[in-house]
Amino acid sequence: MAAQRRRKGGEVESDYIKYLKYKNTGFQVSASDKTLAWWPTKDADRAFCHVEVTKDDGKNFTVRLENGEEKSQPKNEKNFLGVNPPKFDGVEDMGELGYLNEPAVLHNLKKRYDADLFHTYSGLFLVVVNPYKRLPVYTPEIIDIYRGRQRDKVAPHIFAISDAAYRAMLNTRQNQSMLITGESGAGKTENTKKVIQYLTAIAGRAEGGLLEQQLLEFNPILEAFGNAKTTKNNNSSRFGKFIELQFNAGGQITGANTFIYLLEKSRVTAQGAGERNFHIFYQILSKAMPEELKQKLKLTKPEDYFFLNQNACYTVDDMDDAKEFDHMLKAFDILNINEEERLAIFQTISAILHLGNLPFIDVNSETAGLKDEVELNIAAELLGVSAAGLKAGLLSPRIKAGNEWVTRALNKPKAMASRDALCKALFGRLFLWIVQKINRILSHKDKTALWIGVLDISGFEIFQHNSFEQLCINYTNEKLQQFFNHHMFTLEQQEYEREKIDWTFVDYGMDSQDCIDLIEKKPMGILPLLDEQTVFPDADDTSFTKKLFQTHENHRNFRRPRFDANNFKIVHYAGEVEYQTSAWLEKNRDPLEDDLSNLCKKSSVRFVTGLFDEDLMPSFKAAPAEEEKAAAGGSRNRSTGRGKGGAQFITVAFQYKEQLAHLMSMLSSTAPHFIRCIIPNLGKKPGVVSDQLVLDQLKCNGVLEGIRIARKGWPNRLKYDEFLKRYFLLKPGATPTSPSTKDAVKDLIEHLIAKEPTKVNKDEVRFGVTKIFFRSGQLAAIEELREQAISKMVVSIQAGARAFLARRMYDKMREQTVSAKILQRNIRAWLELKNWAWYQLYVKARPLISQRNFQKEIDDLKKQVKDLEKELAALKDANAKLDKEKQLAEEDADKLEKDLAALKLKILDLEGEKADLEEDNALLQKKVAGLEEELQEETSASNDILEQKRKLEAEKGELKASLEEEERNRKALQEAKTKVESERNELQDKYEDEAAAHDSLKKKEEDLSRELRETKDALADAENISETLRSKLKNTERGADDVRNELDDVTATKLQLEKTKKSLEEELAQTRAQLEEEKSGKEAASSKAKQLGQQLEDARSEVDSLKSKLSAAEKSLKTAKDQNRDLDEQLEDERTVRANVDKQKKALEAKLTELEDQVTALDGQKNAAAAQAKTLKTQVDETKRRLEEAEASAARLEKERKNALDEVAQLTADLDAERDSGAQQRRKLNTRISELQSELENAPKTGGASSEEVKRLEGELERLEEELLTAQEARAAAEKNLDKANLELEELRQEADDAARDNDKLVKDNRKLKADLDEARIQLEEEQDAKSHADSSSRRLLAEIEELKKRVAKETSDKQKAQDQKANYQRENESLKADRDSIERRNRDAERQVRDLRAQLDDALSRLDSEKRAKEKSVEANRELKKVVLDRERQSLESLSKFNSALESDKQILEDEIGDLHEKNKQLQAKIAQLQDEIDGTPSSRGGSTRGASARGASVRAGSARAEE
C-alpha cells in the first residue's frame, strides 16, 4: 500500500509538472543582437509577426518587414510594440511581462496553450483558455496540492483562486465573490463547477455528507433546464447565475443560494440555424424516459414537435440525452424532489411541446382558427385547464375597456405570438420554481456566517446583429468592468502608498461612468426612455429611435449610424457596438394575455397554479438593498406582473436594472476575484489558437483594458535582493549579495543609466521601501542587456573551450609523431643490422664450427643434469614450503584487506553521514535564519501594532480631553457671554475704569477665540479620528491575521524542526553504536562523531532558541488580539462620543457666527507659523541632500576601491596562469632535450659494440672505417635532431605569432572594452616572456648538443686507439661490471618467473649444466643459457639440411635472450673463457672458432643495444 501511495503521489506530481508548470528550456543565447518588434499583419491566421528594428532614435523608429520593405513611424506606446526577451516566454503572470502590449499577451497565452497550460494570471485576473480536451488537472490529488497554498507558491489554477477566496474569507471575515465571465463556449459553467467542487472538498465534512452531494449535483438540473446547444458550444448556459456558497463561522460549508439573470426564454419557441432547444425537451423524449410515462404525456419523438424540428438538429456530439436524463433523475433523488413534483415538471414541459404543435389557420384576414383541436385538448389536460378557455385565450382574448370587457379577435400571426408568450411564460416560471426549490433545499440562513459568491455570466457581446438582450449583457459588463477597475487599481495604488512611491491617486473606476449613465441614468437614459416609450400606446420602435437621437445626439458615447436610421451605436469600453431597435418595445413589455394568465391561475393542477402565484416573483417596490434576497433574479424576457401594492406594470428593463443594482450591491460588499474565460477557436479544436478571436475576447473581457491602465502605473516590480541576484553581472565588480541591497541596486541602476542611456531611463524607475518599480517595457530592456552580457560570456567560454580542445589535439598528434619516429628508428636499426656484412658472415660461419668431443660433453652434461635434478628437487621442496607460506600470507593479506575495506566503507559511511548532517545543519541554519527574519518582521509588526495602539490610546485620550474641554468651553462660553453683557453694562456705567476693563475684555476675547478654534478643531478631529479608528481597526485586524498566519508558519516550522531533531538524534544514536563497536583503531571516526554530536547540540540550542522565539510570537499574537478587543471597545466608545459630538455640534454652530470675527486675528499667526515651518523644512531638505551627497561620495569611493582590488586580483591570476604556462613549456623542452640526448648516446654505443666484436678479424681497418662512418651517421642524426629542435622552436615562435595575431584580432573586435584590451596586452607581454624563456632554453639545448658532439668525437678517437682484442675484452668487462648492479636488481624479479619456469621444466633441465659451471646467483638465467648452447650444438649434429631453419630458430632465440644476456656478467665471462680455451685447444679450427665467438659477442651486444633503444 505504501508503495502504491508513493507511486500514486509520483504520478500526481508528474501531472502537476506536466500540465500546470511551464517547461522552460533554459537560457538560449540569441543568434544576433537584433532588436525585434511586433507588427500587425493582414494574415487571417496571424495577427502579428516579428519585424527587425533597423533604426531607433528615440522619437521615430524604422522596421524591416518580412517582405524586405522598410517603414518608419513615430515611437510611442501605440506604434512601438516591443518583443519580450525569451526569459518572459510562458510566464505565469502576464503582469510580469516587460512589454505589456496586445501581441505580447497573445504570444504568452499561445506559448502556454501549446504546452497544455490553459491557466494564466494577468494581474488580478485568472485567464482560462478552453483546452477542448480532458486533462488530469481537477483530480482530488490536485486539490490536495492546492489546499492551503499561497497563490504565488503554486502554478496558476482555478483551484488557487478558489483557495485564496476561501482563506481570505476566514482570515478577514469578509464575504468573497468570484466573477467568471466569457463568451458562450469559453468554459464558464465548467469553471463554476470546478469552484464548487474545490470548495466542497476543502470545506465539507471529511466523510462527505448529503449536503456535499447536493451541492455537487444541483448543477446538472440547472444545465438540463437552462443549457442548450449553440453554434459555439454544445452545452451553452442560456442564463446568468450567481451562486452564493454559504459557510458557518468555522469555515464549514452549510448550503448554497442561487440567483439567475437573463434566461433566454425566446429559445423555447425559436432557435438559430444549427442550434437546439433546451436539453430537457430532448431528454424527456429519449429512451431513458419510461414508455408508460411517455404514453401518459402523449410524447413521441423530437421530429414530431414544431418547437424542436425547425432546424432538424436533434443530437449533440459527445452528449447522450438518455444518460443525461438519468443523471438528472439521480440529482432529483439527491435533492429530494419527489415523484409528484417530477411528474408536474414533465407535464409542463410536455404541454409546451403540444402547444407548439397547435395548427393555426386563417379564417379570414383578421381572424384565426385551429385546423383541429387534438393538441389543444392534450395541452389543456396536462395544464389542468379547460380546452375551450385555452382556445378562447389564444384566439379571441378579452381586454378591459373602461369598466367593460371586450373580446378581441386575433389573426394568425398574433395568435401564434400569444401562444409563444404563454409557452415562454410557462417555461420561465418553471425554471424559477426549480431554482427556488433548490434554494429551499440547500440554503440554511440561520447557520450562515459568511459566503462566497460565484458569478457565471456572459462577457461582452459584439455580434453582427445586436438587439435588446446584447444591450442588457453589455450594460452588465460595463458595471462589472467599472467595479473591477475601481477594485484593481485601488489595491495597486495602496501598494504604491505602502512602498512610498510618488503617485497621484486616480479613480479609474469612473472610466465607464459616462457609458453607464447613457444607458441607465434617469430621466433620459436609454433604458428609462425605453420604459417611457413602452407605456405610450402609439409608440413604436421608430419613435423610440428618434427619441434617442434627439436626446443623445451630442453624447460622446453615442453614435448615429451612417446607413440604417433605425439603429444606433454605443461606444463601450470594449469597442463600438451597433444595436438594432427592432421589436425592442415588444420585448420590453413581454406581454401575456390576461385571459391566459387568469386561466392558468385557476388550473386544477396545483403545480401550475403555483407557477402563476405572484409570490413566485420578487417585488421591486423597494430598493434592492432593502429587499430580502430573492430566490432568483428573473429572466432575460420577464413577463409583466403585479406588485403587492396593487396593479403595477413592470417592464423588463426596469426589472433588470433592479436586479443588476442588487447584484452590484452584493458584489460591493465582497472582496472580488476575477476569472476570464477564452475561446481559442470556433472549430472547437484542441491546440489551435485564432489570434484575432482571442484578441477580441481579451478586449471584451477587460484584460487589455486592465493592461492599458497598468501602463500608467508601475506594473513591473522586483524585490531588491531578487533584482540584484539576477542583474548584478551588468556592473563590473558587483556581487549577487550585499548588506544593503537597496543601495547596491541604486548603484547598479545608476551605472546602467550612465552606460546605456538610450535603454535605461531614470524616469522609468522608482525605488520603494522593499521593491524596485519599473514602467512598462523598462524591465524588458534591462533583461535584454543581461542577455547580451551573458552572450558575450558564453562566446568567451566557447572560445576558451575550443582553444583547449585544439591544444589537446595538437599534443596528441605530436605524441603520435614522436612514437612513429621511434618505431621507424628501431626498424631502420634492425634492417641495418640484418644487412651488415659481418652479421651475415656470422650467420653463415656459425654452422661450420669444428666438431668437439660431444660424447664426453654429453656425458658430463648428463651427470650435471642428475646433480641439478637433485638440486631441483630440493628447490621444489623449498618452493612448495614457500608456496604454502605464501598462500597463508596471501590469505592473511586478503583478510586484512577485507577488514581494511570494511573499515574504509564504514569510514565512508560515517563521512557520508557527517556530510548529510552538515547539510541538514546548513538547512537548519537557513531555516533558523529565515525564522529569525520572520520573527524580526513579526516583532516589527507587533511593535507597529503596539505603536498604533499607543497612538490610538493617545488619540483616544486627546479625544476625551477634547470633548471634556469642549464641554467646559461650552459652559465657559455661556458664562463668558453673560459676563460680557454685564461688563458691557458696567462699561457704560463706569467709563472711568475703561482702560483696565478694556484689557480684561481683550484677554477674555482672546480666550474665547482660542476656545472657539479649539472647538472647531475638536469637531473636525472627532470626525477624522472616527474614520481613522475605523481604518486602523481594519488594518489591525489584517495585522492580527498576518500574525496568525505567521504563527501558523512558525508552528509548522517548529514541528519540522522537531522532526529533524528526532531524526538527528536517531542518526547520532546509530553513529555512536557504530563507534562503540569499532572503537579500537578508529579514533578519527570517533572524533567525527563528537563533531556531529556538537553540531546536534548546536541544532538543539537553535531549536530551543526558535521555541523561545515562537513563544514570543504567540505572546505578540495574544497582545495583538487584546489590542484588537481594545480597539473594538474604543471604536464603540468613539461611536458614542461621536453621537454626543453631533448633538453638541448643532449647538456650537449657532455660536460660531458670533466668534468668527475673533478668529481672524489668529490667521496672521498661523501664516507666520506656516512660513517658519516651510523654512525649517527647506533647511531639513538641504541637510538631507548634503547627507545623501556624502553617502553617495563614500559609496563611490568604496566602489572604486573594490574595482581596484578586483583588477589586482585579476592581474595576479593572469600572472600565475602565464607562469604555469611557461613552466609547462620548459618541461616539454627538457623532455625533448632528454630524448635528443638518449638518441645521441645510443649512436656511440652501437658504434662501440661493433668495433669490439670484430677484433683479430681480417679487415680491421675496414671495420674501423665502418665504425667511423657509423659515428658520423650518429652525428648526422644528432644534427638532424638539432634541426628538429630548431623546427620545434620555430613552431613555438609561430604559435607566439599566432597568439599575437589572435590578440590583435581580439583588440580589433573589442576596442570598446578597455578591460579586454588590457588583458590582451598583458597576455601578449607574458607570451613574449615565455618566448624569451623558450629562446634561452634553445640556447641551452644548442650548448648541450655541442657537448654531445664533443663526446662523440672523443669516443671515436677512443675507438681508433683500440688495437688489440685484450683491450677490447677489458673494456667489455668494465662495461659488464657497470651492469652488475642492474643484474642484481633484476634477479629480485626471479620470483615472478617461477610459474613460467615450471611450464618450461624440460627446457630448464637441459640448461642446468651450463648454469652450474657459471655458478651465477640467477640459476634460472644460467640454465636458460646452457639450454640455448646445448640446443645449438644438437642442431649442428643432427642435419645440415636444416641449416636455414636452424639459423632462423637461433636468431629468434638470440633475440629473445638479448636482454637477459646483457645483464649476466659472470655468465658472459665464463663463455669468453670457454671460447678462448676452444681457440687455444683446437688450432686447426682456430680461425673459425674465433670468428664464431666474435660473431656471437657482436650479436649479443647488438641485441642489447636494440633492447636499450
Swiss-Prot record:
This is Myosin-2 heavy chain, non muscle. Keywords: Actin-binding, ATP-binding, Calmodulin-binding, Coiled coil, Methylation, Motor protein, Myosin, Nucleotide-binding, Phosphoprotein. GO terms for biological process: actin filament organization. Residues 1483-1509 are annotated as: Nonhelical tailpiece. Myosin II heavy chain is two-headed. It self-assembles into filaments. Hexamer of 2 heavy chain subunits (MHC), 2 alkali light chain subunits (MLC) and 2 regulatory light chain subunits (MLC-2). Belongs to the TRAFAC class myosin-kinesin ATPase superfamily. Myosin family. The lineage of its organism: Eukaryota, Amoebozoa, Discosea, Longamoebia, Centramoebida. It comes from Acanthamoeba castellanii (Amoeba). The rodlike tail sequence is highly repetitive, showing cycles of a 28-residue repeat pattern composed of 4 heptapeptides, characteristic of alpha-helical structures. This region is interrupted by a hinge and joined by a nonhelical tailpiece where the regulatory phosphorylation sites reside. GO terms for cellular component: cytoplasm; membrane; myosin complex. Residues 623-643, 958-1049, 1068-1141, 1170-1195, 1213-1259, 1352-1425, 1474-1509 are annotated as: Disordered. Residues 1253-1482 are annotated as: Alpha-helical tailpiece (LMM).
